[in-house]
Regions:
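Basic/hydrophobic alpha-helical interface regions
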Residues: 1-72, 76-115
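Negatively charged
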Residues: 107-248
Length: 248
C-alpha cells in the first residue's frame, strides 16, 4: 500500500467532512480497501454484510485534488440514494441501472474526471432519479428495437467508477446500514446548513431515506394480535353477575 496515496484519500475525506459533511460523513462508516482488481474506485460490500470503499492507487494518483473529491462525492451519493440495494430490489438490468444511477448523480457534481456519463449524453433532462433515467433508457432501446445492453454498447458510454462490487449481499442488513449512514450524514449537513447542495438533490436524498412502513409486517402483527385476543377471551369463564337473562 502506498502511504502517500492513502494520505491523499484521507485528506480528501477530511475536507469533505469539514466543508460538505453530507458526503464526508458517509466514509466514516466504510472500510477503505486498496484493490488492483478494480480500475477506478467503487463502493461495494465485503463479507456480504459490511460496506466498503475500494480504490485503485494508480487511479487516485492521476486525479487532481478537485477530481478526487468529486469522485468521492459520487461514491457517497450511491450510498445516500440506496443505489446498491435499488438495482437488486427492482430487478433492473445491472449495466442499464449503473448508467442511469450515474446520470442521476453526475449532473449534481462539478470537476468529475473525463469519461463521466451525463443525462445530455442521451439528450435527457437533468435532475431526475435513477429510476426515471432507467425507464428512459429502456424506452429508447425499445424505440431503436435493441436490447438495453446493445444500445449502451453502441453509444459507447461507461461509468466513471466500478459497479462490479454491487454483488451478492444480505439485503436486509445492508439496507439497514445504509439507512443509518444516510441518517447520520443528513443530520451532519443539517447542522451546517445545506449551502450549495442543489435543491433537487436534497429532495431526492430526503425522499430516498423516508421511513417506509412495511404494511405486510404490520397486517401480520395485527392479525396475530386479534387471534391472540380471541383465544384469550374464549378461555375466560363468564362472570355470572353479567350473564344476560331473558325475561319470562
Amino acid at each position: 500500500m502506498d502511504r502517500n496515496i492513502r494520505d491523499r484519500l484521507e485528506s480528501a475525506i477530511s475536507k469533505l467532512l469539514l466543508y460538505h459533511p453530507l458526503y464526508g460523513e458517509v466514509f466514516l462508516f466504510l472500510n477503505k480497501i486498496e484493490s488492483k482488481t478494480i480500475p477506478t474506485m467503487a463502493v461495494g460490500v465485503i463479507r456480504q454484510v459490511d460496506l466498503a470503499l475500494y480504490y485503485n492507487e494508480e487511479f487516485i494518483k492521476n486525479l487532481s485534488g478537485d477530481e478526487l473529491r468529486a469522485v468521492l462525492k459520487h461514491e457517497a451519493l450511491h450510498i445516500l440514494l440506496h443505489h446498491l440495494v435499488r438495482v437488486r430490489h427492482a430487478g433492473y438490468n445491472p449495466r442499464g441501472f449503473n448508467i442511469a444511477a450515474d446520470m442521476a448523480i453526475n449532473c449534481h457534481i462539478l470537476e468529475l474526471p473525463k469519461g463521466a456519463v451525463y443525462p445530455k449524453t442521451f439528450d435527457l433532462p437533468e435532475g431526475q432519479s435513477a429510476d426515471w433515467y432507467y425507464k428512459s433508457l429502456k424506452d429508447e432501446a425499445e424505440k431503436q428495437k435493441k436490447d438495453l445492453e446493445q444500445m449502451l454498447a453502441d453509444k459507447g458510454v461507461d461509468t466513471v467508477d466500478d459497479h462490479g462490487l454491487w454483488g451478492e449481499f444480505d439485503e436486509e442488513i445492508i439496507s439497514e446500514k445504509i439507512k443509518n449512514i444516510a441518517e447520520s450524514a443528513i443530520k451532519a449537513q443539517e447542522k451546517k446548513g445545506w449551502g450549495d447542495t442543489p435543491g433537487g438533490l436534497v429532495e431526492q436524498i430526503i425522499a430516498a431515506n423516508k421511513p417506509v412502513v412495511n404494511w405486510k409486517k404490520e397486517v401480520k402483527w395485527f392479525i396475530n394480535k386479534v387471534v391472540e385476543l380471541g383465544r384469550r377471551n374464549t378461555r375466560m369463564r363468564p362472570n355470572r353477575r353479567y350473564i344476560f337473562q331473558s325475561p319470562g
